[in-house]
């Protein structure tokens, strides 16, 4: 149908974005800007946009997809978890890093959804009160508010570590630049 025709016409443009001069540094700067805009009081509670949160997993997967997806069509998937699987299968990210990112992504998504259910509105902040944290603990299979804090801290640190190793790797920028000059 018409939608398929449109997708076929637009797809090459999507996968050529990684060929733009300065694409990798601009993408990195965009992520830094997003984190810098978080209010200081919310920095350690921002599940979606904060350092080590959902966006770090998504930016990591999408950057690698856009850099390598020009050449490798197996990376042209829409969702984050399948993207991480494809990136690991293609050798663009270690299987261990992909598994850690997938596990963290699933947990952070569940936490985000549970918090939204409790508040009956879109929010991406961990509760800042003991009752809210205990309620979240029960909703995600943990026992205490302290356990939520520990798990959140460990998870966000693991994401930040993997994100830093991949997203800021000089190899990613070098590959992007080499593909620009080959194209």
Residues of each region from the PLM?
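A nucleotide- and high-energy phosphate-metabolite-utilizing enzyme signature
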Residues: 1-179, 183
């Amino acid at each position: 149908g018409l939608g398929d025709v449109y997708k076929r016409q637009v797809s090459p443009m999507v996968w050529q974005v990684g060929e733009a001069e300065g694409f990798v540094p601009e993408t990195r700067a965009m992520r830094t800007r997003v984190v810098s805009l978080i209010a200081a009081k919310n920095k350690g509670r921002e599940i979606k946009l904060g350092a080590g949160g959902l966006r770090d997993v998504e930016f990591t997967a999408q950057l690698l997809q856009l850099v390598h997806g020009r050449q490798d069509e197996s990376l042209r998937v829409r969702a984050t978890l399948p993207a991480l699987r494809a990136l690991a299968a293609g050798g663009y990210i270690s299987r261990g890093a992909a598994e850690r990112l997938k596990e963290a992504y699933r947990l952070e998504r569940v936490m985000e959804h549970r918090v939204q259910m409790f508040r009956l509105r879109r929010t991406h902040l961990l509760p800042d009160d003991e009752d809210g944290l205990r309620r979240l603990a029960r909703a995600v299979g943990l026992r205490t508010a302290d356990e939520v804090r520990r798990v959140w801290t460990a998870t966000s640190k693991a994401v930040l570590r993997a994100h830093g190793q991949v997203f800021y790797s000089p190899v990613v920028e070098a590959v992007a630049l080499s593909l620009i000059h080959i194209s």
